[in-house]
Curated annotation (Swiss-Prot):
Example of a GO cellular component annotation carried by this entry: small ribosomal subunit
One record GO biological process: translation
Residues spanning the membrane: none
A Pfam family assignment: Ribosomal_S16
Gene3D superfamilies the record matches: 3.30.1320.10
GO molecular function, one term: structural constituent of ribosome
Stretch forming the signal peptide: none
Organism name: Coprothermobacter proteolyticus (strain ATCC 35245 / DSM 5265 / OCM 4 / BT)
Entry keywords, A to Z: Ribonucleoprotein, Ribosomal protein
Family matches, as HAMAP family: Ribosomal_bS16
Protein's recorded name: Small ribosomal subunit protein bS16
Family: Belongs to the bacterial ribosomal protein bS16 family.
Length: 81
């Protein structure tokens, strides 16, 4: 099973916020996931990024690949070099 760390869109129409989730790459964007590891709200000033640091590090250590957008968020949160 190939697993990715990616964004799941939540919120009202035109007012998106996102959950950072670990999911099978074959699942649809807003479909089934394994675990919620964080939250991202681009609409606040400054944008809100909340991550469960221990769980993110665990999933990265077992080989989960983050998507490009999640990789940018992890860099902003100083969790990736």
């Amino acid at each position: 099973m190939a697993v990715k760390m990616r964004l799941l869109r939540v919120g009202a129409k035109g007012q998106p916020s996102y959950r950072v989730v670990v999911a099978d790459e074959r699942s649809p964007r807003d479909g089934r996931f394994i675990e919620i590891v964080g939250f991202y709200n681009p609409r606040t000033e400054p944008e809100t990024i909340q991550l469960k640091e221990d769980r993110v590090k665990y999933w990265l250590s077992v080989g989960v690949k983050p998507t490009d957008s999640v990789r940018i968020l992890l860099r902003k949160a100083n969790m990736l070099s």
